[in-house]
Amino acid sequence: MLAYLFAQREAVKRGLPEDFLADLLIWAVPMAIISARIYYVIMKWENYSDNPIDIIKVWEGGIAIHGALIGAFVTAYIFCRIKGVSFLKVADITAPSILIGQSIGRWGNFVNQEAHGGPVSREFLESLMIPNWIIDNMYVQLNGVMTYVHPTFLYESLWNVIGLVILLMLRKVNLKRGEIFFGYIIWYSIGRFFIEGLRTDSLYLIAELRSAQVVSIIAIVFAVGMIIYRRFIQKTNERYTD
């Protein structure tokens, strides 16, 4: 809700219809959940091939943020085309709010004691100067042994907060249209690539190839490529404030 209200204020300021984002969310949220589940099932197909009915049991866990983002972005693109609104304009407006949602959402991993990293010492966690109530809850069972683990949820949450501040600063620069959105993709993907390397519950493509890291690299290359293309080849004059 906080992320929506934050985006809604900017959307109205930038000339979008007052009900535009609400209508978009009606479609984007369900599609994000569905695609997040599909992404997870594809990566974990061996767990579902014998019992396909388990695919619909989302309440048992098993969704992936990259799948959710892909589903949401594709839905938003189609929605914007139907409404005759620039997708990149909407993406620029909502990018900071996506980081707000992701930053808050990672605390769900803390509550569920999931998506954590590998083993570390308590002394290491104390050296990070994080509250004891977080440290105490990072004492979990890992491979049958109780140990302290990396609070990867916190790393990503803080990374997203920093990214939020950067994107809000970039708004004032009045970059070319789409560059705030592409900046979001680059920033989030860099953080996710390195944080993913610490996690113990990664989805794998093959062998030791973590899917989130592969997707992050592809996303960075795509975003950088789009910035270069729009600036130097397409030479667009559209700006964030247009």
Q: PLM features: what roles do these ranges have?
A:
Residues M1-D242:
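A feature for loop-to-transmembrane-helix boundaries and adjacent hydrophobic helices
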